[in-house]
Amino acid sequence: NTKYSFKLFVIFDTGATGDFKFRHAGPSSPTLVRIRRHHIIGAGTAYAGIAIDTAYSSVDVAVAGSAGPGVVEMDGIVHNGANAGNFEFQWAQNASEAVDTTVRAGSYIQYRAL
């Protein structure tokens, strides 16, 4: 039944068609989820996908664009219910391509109990 706040910052590189996809997940039946998220597509210059989520992801969020670096940022609060488990950031390359999508060292999740 712990309450948490968190901040996530992910830097990735992707090829022209591989792109990036992600979702957030956690223990079932939280009592509160409020997550602000946005991203910059590969080689982009402006935020996109700006949203406030009130539940964990039910589908992947695709970050499709051009080859190059991109960013995903999230922050929020989670009030966990009675079920144990971890908050997770899950990611993958969105489409098959010869160039691997890479999450760069220095990407992070910070959290604290409230």
What does each model-identified segment do?
Residues N1-L114:
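Surface-exposed molecular-recognition determinants
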